[in-house]
């Protein structure tokens, strides 16, 4: 038995953003068709390090994608000049259970998070949308913008970040391609935007109804716990709300949990993107829409499967004998 090992560069060469968006669409359709097995993620806390390790398995029956992602969050690593978040994705042979490929998870996590926003933007943002606001300038900001440019012709980029230095560095990378503006207030960054991408760890709402366009589409991917929220209750109550998975969002998304508890948003009115993709009956492109994603293992494995196929096709990686 051999296990193929991919370097970060191998992974980057083996998938494009457009391929990742297509993989997201197929994964969520399979979820809606109940063709996936998606157990709850398992967390192990390492108290003495104030750290956490998460294990996220999944199986997509249609294309026989079986595997898991393991991610560790060790904040103290920063004192050793090591990344605080590390992880791997392993795919298994769905016929034999044998492990077949191992790859770094950090890049693919950012890519698939961008890709799911790209998928939502493809179907819910105006066709002529050309102005995007990126709220937050961390690891997700680049792939969020990359995904927007994969599905819309973006001309203007507005940036807001709590850390001005990060915003300036991000903007510098974009100046040759877009009309870029850095704003000191979120309200100024979002007021003219057709598309808003929030990728922050905020515990207080950043986006409010009076500050956005009536047709704005919002991708909210930063908050992933009950104590975090990026989108105001007034926005959620006024908009069509679409989520990756209702069960996951009602467990992990602070703003959605609050909106449902306060009856600002009715649970039965929340759309799951996979269910909508099955019919595509209603067009929301001229309305205010919010897409909320907390991340699912099927997203990781679906992009990893694309990487696996392309790596084999292009003979990338090395085979390591393990027995």
Regions found by a protein language model. Name each.
Residues 132-133, 289:
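Conserved beta-strand elements of the Class I
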Residues 177-261:
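Rossmann-like adenosine-cofactor binding region
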Residues 124-131, 213-214:
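Short helix-loop-beta connector
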Residues 137-138:
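Glycine-rich Rossmann-fold phosphate-binding loop(s) that bind the pyrophosphate
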Residues 141-142:
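N-terminal Rossmann-fold NAD(P) dinucleotide-binding loop
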Residues 150-174:
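NAD(P)-binding Rossmann-fold cofactor-contacting core
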